[in-house]
């Protein structure tokens, strides 16, 4: 073993107790005192180190998606998509790429029950030969807001009251009463899918519109969908109370136990595609993440399969320190001008540096599994071995060069600097279509949940009236039923 290349690992554990520096500890049961009943001595370094380490075990939890569980596996291409993208990991059917996936709730704290009504996160990290590619999505295909500048506000509204630390619907409906685009997501939130049975029976969506680019430079808009092969299953409200009361980590345990038993969960990756030349032809804006692309207009096409066949080895190292970033794309995949997507490109790396440190990408779970090279040096907790003498670019002593240029979207943008709302809001059509697609019993469950939430005492008559009017514009019969049960007259 080269002592200068040694890295700490439990595979190198000694048979006896030591300090973090490797010094032997002969007694880990008693502190050092002056006599058997005297005061503890400050020179008991092992005790000081043990306590200091303990009081620093926890790191800042994620501001959203704090409660979650990860698993490892592979993604395998099953269908040829080289006409759409030059991405190496999608180069041919049969190609496999290692992945790690993290499932999560969104709003509630680390350790909260996994049976609460809440969107779920579905984040996938592909360790490709061209670098890491992260699809950081949810189990809903839409989101509450369309402009990233409102992201802190919507999270604050859904988070607990800063005075009482209690989550309250009056705060949620007050904030969202200024944002009718949130109706689309509430049509998922208060639906049966608002509480998945577990992570294995849950859909995933990339939510944003991405761009695929082929070798010729042709750009295609794309939406990513994960479809569980075992089907979608949800918990009804009474079931969720029973399950959560018996085991607040039921989804985590289900995922872990299923993989351990060899019952590997699997999802099909499906895509919807659109020619950017057609984006102005629809009643909605295809880059508006509060909208779905109707499947009758944009059918799903299969791409590959995701199989999770290995549990993580250490929850803290591979779940808490796992960091996703929508900005991590590979050649052949790029961003769109979705306003929330654009904000996330900055926000995720920023929060990971706060939570994990400037060198979070050196952590094994986050580091790419391919060679890489840059001059990003030093900083706290830098443990990368480097022996170069040149830490600048360009140099005649270091032959490193620019990478081969890859095609990216090159559409010309023009316009004035301004802060404005998109032209095609179309806030009511899709939630109404979704409601009308349900069977009557499902409609009734949705209505009951909505009525219960809007019946919170602190919600004013004005706010209730706004929501009744909006849902009436989505579907007249829904609005009438809601108005009757809330004793509110629609005001359209």
UniProtKB/Swiss-Prot annotation:
Residues 8-32 have a biased composition (Polar residues). It is found in: Peroxisome; Glyoxysome. Gene3D superfamilies: Catalase core domain (2.40.180.10). Heme binds at residue 348. Abundant in hypocotyls and roots. Low levels are seen in the endosperms and cotyledons. The active site is at 65, 138. Its cofactor is heme. Its main location: other. It comes from the Eukaryota. It holds the Pfam family Catalase-rel. Occurs in almost all aerobically respiring organisms and serves to protect cells from the toxic effects of hydrogen peroxide. This is Catalase isozyme 2. It comes from Ricinus communis (Castor bean).
